[in-house]
Amino acid sequence: GLWSTIKQKGKEAAIAAAKAAGQAALGAL
């Protein structure tokens, strides 16, 4: 349903943000 789609998009966005944060942290080393 719509809610599961919203949750899936949110999870994907959270994963993408975590990856970006990890890349930024590595770049700052």
Swiss-Prot record:
The primary structure of this peptide is identical to that of Dermaseptin 01 from Pithecopus oreades (AC P83637). Belongs to the frog skin active peptide (FSAP) family. Dermaseptin subfamily. Its main location: secreted. Keywords: Amidation, Amphibian defense peptide, Antibiotic, Antimicrobial, Fungicide, Secreted. Has antibacterial activity against the Gram-negative bacterium E.coli and the Gram-positive bacterium S.aureus. Has antiprotozoal activity against L.amazonensis. Has antifungal activity. Has no hemolytic activity. This is Dermaseptin-H7. It comes from the Eukaryota. One of its GO terms (biological process) is defense response to bacterium. The modification Leucine amide is found at L29. One of its GO terms (cellular component) is extracellular region. Expressed by the skin glands. It is found in: Secreted. The keyword Secreted applies.
